[in-house]
Every structure is written in structure tokens, then in C-alpha cells.
Amino acid sequence: MKNMTLKEIAVACGGIYYGDDESYYKEVSSVVIDSRKVEKDCLFIAIRGTRVDGHMFIPQTIRDGALCALSEKRIENASYPYILVTSCEQALKDIAEHYRKSLNLKVVGVTGSVGKTSTKEMIASVLGEKYDVLKTAGNFNNEIGLPLTIFNIREEHEVAVLELGISNFGEMERLAKIARPDICVITNIGVAHLEHLKSRDGILKAKTEIFLYMNPNGSIILNGDDDKLSTVHPANGIQPVFFGLDDSRDFYADQVESCGLRGTNAVFHTPNSTFSAHISIPGEHMVLNALAGIAAGYALGMNDEEIKAGIEALVPLAGRNNLIETDSLTIIDDCYNANPASTKASLDVLAKADTRQVTVLGDMFELGPTEKQMHYEVGKYAADLGIDILVCIGQLSEHMATGASEQCSKTQVFYFETKDDFFEQADRILNPKDTVLVKASNGMKFSEIVNVLKER
């Protein structure tokens, strides 16, 4: 991270410094909350987790090389510097906000109900053709992960592409206050997190909190094909730019041609030009992601050649529509997360396979009071597509199995309460050369299924 002294940190978070004068003016090398990732001269912030209290590890982190610790407790007779704060979690956010303000780079904030990560990856791939880009790693998109991502920004970075994930009102405002985006991208307004946000209108309200702390001279990029986002009016005097498959959008695509599991070809139209590109990851939703990347590239002064190269350089992440070919199976690893819209999109991809189509689906979380019906509808959708075999695992997924079984379809349906139950029957269900889609909410830990299938 860029230079920041303990004095600067104490002032930023309103903490009280305890320690020697010399250390007060020393710079920290990084900020960590995991005692296992301590490095020389880092700042360790003792976060209280649901299972572990970081305060337990403060002495060990100092022995391992940390310069200072942030603590909510007075440390009697401490032989090392520490900063006393009311809340370590709030201090983490305050320090990140201060650090972000000190940085001279462009920030792209990406949010939405579905496709945040794949859109973030596409935008980073496009912008990476011209700029030195830092992007959110893994699922570091919440009020803990975003600050840690901010601290990874170095002086050489020219653009940061940050994923912002929320599940309740007020969270986006707090994230935007830290990120201070120059460009805001919203992928869609779906039904994820209905448990807290109650309706799609509630989700729209929560997601558009991202505009509250954006650069007043920045850009807003929205999916114009989304019925909710298409109603968004200028925010803070900024006229939104819309992308989509409809030719009335500012950025649109047509002549979309599926290459099966090998990706998609499309022709892209900008306000000034037209060009074609190949996307290596399958699915129509990836065309929308590419359009978001094109709009972001235009906002940052890129030309068509650079943008096309960035689109075609994109590679999938593990657990995100990642195609894995083994001696016996073709696996579509999309197990990182799931909601009804993303699961249906993945089923559309599977339906393009020219071998026997098998999907292993699990529970989708945080869908609110209509969760059973939504699982039922996903099962019905799989059957209507004519997927050969549907395997449903988990308590909620029993409704998925019911939704498929009640259709007049060729789809064979198997239901298991647990992953272990499925593993016992997998050899009976799967055939050599099958194409297998694996998808569920992250809490279902379906990466275990992917790992087992890779070894068959």
C-alpha cells in the first residue's frame, strides 16, 4: 500500500495512540485482519468475528512482525505500539476511506443482483489493455472485504475495478463512501436478497445508493434492458448511459452467435463505431457484460482495438462458468453462487451442450418468503429446457425437484438431502462424456462436488 504513518492512521480512525514517539511516525507496509497473513511492519486490526476474536492474536502478530495493532481494549503494560478505538470494524472502514481519498486513480464500482463478479472481471480485462488495473479478488466485496481491497492499491495502479455487494439498506451507501467511484455500473435488479430488501423496488433503491458518493463528473452505466434500471433518471446531474441488446441503447449488440460451450460471437455497436468480438465464456449474459466493459472503456478514453482485445483476453474464474474437461466429463463449474436468474442463465448454457446434459443444483439462499416457489420455478425451467438429468441437493432444492417432476418432460430427476447421498449414487447417474453443470449458493459448498467430479 501507499505510505501511511501510525499518526495518520490514528487521526483517520479517531483512535488513541499508545507507544513510543519514534514508531508514531513510522509507515505501515500493509493492513491485515488475519493473524496468519501478518507481514513485517503491517497494521493488524483485531476484528471480532462470530467464532474468533482477533484480540486474542495481538501479541502473536507483534512477535510475527506487525508494527502496530488496533484494539478495542486497553492493553496493560504493552511493550509495543497500539491504537485504541471504539470499534475495530468501523476503524477499518474509516482508515480505508482516508486512504482512498489520498489516491489519484479512477475507480469503477460494480454492483447488481446478478453478474457482479463476471462483469467486474470483464471490465478489468478490457481496461487492462490500456491501464494498470487492480480488481476485487474473490468475494472481498462487503464492508470488510472492500477496505482490504482498497489497501491493496499501489501507486502504480491507474484504475481500480471494485465489486460492491450488499444485502440490506444502508450498506451500499457505506461502501460507496469508502470507494468513491468515478464510474458506477449496475448489472441488473433481480430477486437476490429479497429476504431483507423485500421487493425489486427495494433492491433498486438499495443499489442506487452507490450514486451518493460518486464523482460528480463521473459516469453511470446501466443495463437498459432491465425494466427497473431503465427507469433511472439522471443522478447528481449525471445522465446514465444504457447498454443492452435493444438497438435503442447507447451501447448495444446484435448478430449474437453461440459457439456452444466455447463462447459467443457478437457485433457490438457504440455511439461512434461497430466491431465484432469473440467472448470465450458462453452465455448471452456475457454479451451484456461485454457491453458494460465497452461502455467503461469508452468512459476512460479507450479505442475499439483496445476494447476488443480486452474482451477476447477474458478468462473464466474457478466457480464462475469455468469449463473443465476431464477424461470422462465436461464440467461447467458455476458453483460459487446462485440465484434464480443466474441459475436459469447457466441452464441456458448447459442446454447448448451436444452431449448428455446433467445439472447438479443446490439451495439458493436469501430469497425471502417466496423461496420455495422460486426453487420450484428453477426446476420447471430445467425440465422445460429438456435437460437430460436434474440432480437436486438440499432442503430447499426438494421444491426444485418437484417443479421438474411435475412437467411433461424427458428430464430425469434425482433428489438428495446431502452431497454425501449424491456421491453414493453418482456412478449410477453419470455416464462418460456427460456435460455436468454444478451450481448452488456458496454456503452449499458445491466446490466439493466439482472436486469429486474432476477425479472421476
PLM region spans:
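N-terminal leader/targeting and accessory segments in enzymes
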Residues: M1-D94, Y252, D354-T355, Y381, ...
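Phosphate-binding loop of NTP-binding sites
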Residues: E8-V11, A91-G224, K228-I238, R428, ...
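Acidic, Mg2+-coordinating active-site environments of NTP-dependent enzymes
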Residues: A12-C13, S71, I75-A78, V185-I331, ...
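Mobile, glycine- and charge-enriched loop segments
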Residues: S35-A46, V133, F151-A160, L347-G368
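Active-site beta-alpha connecting loops in nucleotide-dependent enzymes
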Residues: R51, L317, C335, N339-C408
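Short beta-strands and strand-loop turn motifs
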Residues: E72, L105-V108, L134, V185-V191, ...
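ATP-dependent carboxylate/acyl-activation modules
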Residues: V110, A318-R320, G443, S447-N451
